[in-house]
């Protein structure tokens, strides 16, 4: 619809396994785009799910909350996102581990350099440099730290120093 109306298109790459089809969706948007009074060329935005931390181990620890939440949702359980301390203490079956490995292929997780490399790879795959980031984790400070690390590694001009303004 966005292509037919000549509007910008935003793709949520972070829902389930949508990233498997995202590049095709982006290609179809560009192929069927019709210029409008609003937009002369197609404009695509992609939102990626990212957790960035100082170490790979810490990023995986932070992501454990999200992982348990994903497993619970498969069982019809809807609880608030638990802490990573609680989540990492839960036993995971081999089947659940296999499921998490599959869905986590679509999450960018790691150190600043790893995250930067994967974000840049996604911009090439989608053919856009217009990227949003979704970070689903228990602690606000972990989310904020993730955003700050990403901003630093991309050398963005302004990083909020006074967290009380957020």
Please identify what each model-predicted range represents.
Residues 18, 104, 111, 139, ...:
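Residue-level preference for long, well-ordered alpha-helices that form the structural scaffold
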Residues 123-166:
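Generic C-terminus detector
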Residues 1-26, 30:
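A conserved active-site cap/scaffold subdomain adjacent to cofactor or substrate pockets
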Residues 6, 64-68, 148-149:
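Short, solvent-exposed amphipathic alpha-helical segments in soluble enzyme
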Residues 20-126, 158-164:
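An alpha-helical appendage that flanks or caps ligand/catalytic pockets
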Residues 15, 50-52, 137-139:
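Active-site-proximal loop/turn and secondary-structure-junction residues that shape catalytic pockets
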Residues 9-13, 42-49, 129-133:
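Hydrophobic faces of well-ordered beta-strands that scaffold small-molecule active sites
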């Amino acid at each position: 619809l966005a292509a037919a109306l000549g509007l910008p298109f935003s793709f949520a790459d972070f829902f389930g396994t949508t990233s498997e089809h995202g590049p095709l969706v982006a290609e179809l948007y560009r192929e069927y785009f019709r210029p409008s009074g609003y937009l002369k060329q197609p404009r695509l935005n992609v939102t990626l799910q990212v957790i960035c931390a100082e170490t790979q181990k810490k990023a995986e620890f932070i992501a454990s909350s999200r992982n348990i939440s994903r497993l619970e949702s498969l069982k019809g359980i809807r609880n608030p996102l638990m802490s990573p301390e609680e989540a990492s203490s839960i036993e995971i079956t081999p089947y659940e581990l296999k499921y998490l490995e599959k869905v986590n292929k679509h999450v960018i997780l790691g150190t600043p350099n790893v995250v930067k490399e994967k974000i840049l790879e996604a911009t090439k795959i989608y053919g856009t440099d217009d990227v949003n980031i979704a970070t689903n984790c228990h602690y606000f400070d972990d989310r904020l730290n993730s955003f700050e690390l990403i901003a630093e590694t991309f050398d963005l001009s302004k990083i909020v120093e006074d967290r009380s303004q957020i």
